[in-house]
Amino acid sequence: MGARGNSFPRPSSTPCALHAPNAPAKPAVMRVIGLAGWSGAGKTTLLARLIPTLNARGIAVSTVKHAHHAFDIDTPGKDSHTHRQAGARQVMVASSQRWALMSELRGAPEPALSDLLARMDPVDLVIVEGFKRDAHPKVEVHRAANNKPWLHPDDPAIRAAATDTPPPGALPFAALGEVEAIADLILAHAAPWPS
């Protein structure tokens, strides 16, 4: 392409993690489920235990985390931060260990969960932490010591619970410490995406 082209040829013999020649086959269907619960219920702790449990079953897992506050994964003074501060819409940082793409909204609306999922590589299962107002199926993480009300009576998208006390009603549940049982609930209630 000429100087105004929007793509650059890449030698096909150059393997990289983005286009690995021996990459596992894409799953036939990507499935999505969320973890919903009050702060302090243990969503992140549970997720950190679920991921290796699901991976051990041969299930490729990715996650989406909603942040309620402004956040920055970059470091002031680093080149990538300087690029963003100068007005770059997106900045990609890559190394031999990982790569990350940062997109600046610059006043645009926060992206919907469906828009974020569309940008992810296909995997077997995406577990969403947050986005509790979205309609994707969820497992409620509830801890009695938090003294917070249950979410499932007001959210029909909650299909099961991971809890230290039985939920009211007929909601299927597993004990918070029973990670294998919670993994079973997640797999039973995850929905295909796009639906």
Question: Can you name each region flagged by the protein language model?
Answer:
Residues 104-133:
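Phosphate-binding/switch loop-helix module in NTP-utilizing enzymes
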Residues 17-23:
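Short hydrophobic alpha-helical segments enriched in small aliphatic residues
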Residues 43:
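Conserved lysine of the Walker
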Residues 49-111:
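N-terminal phosphate/diphosphate-binding loop that engages ATP/GTP or pyrophosphate donors
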Residues 35:
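Hydrophobic anchor at the beta1->P-loop junction of P-loop NTPases
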Residues 56, 124, 175-195:
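C-terminal accessory "lid"/substrate-recognition subdomains
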Residues 39:
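The conserved Walker
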Residues 126-128, 138-143, 157-164:
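Short, hydrophobic beta-strand segments that form beta-sheet elements in well-ordered domains
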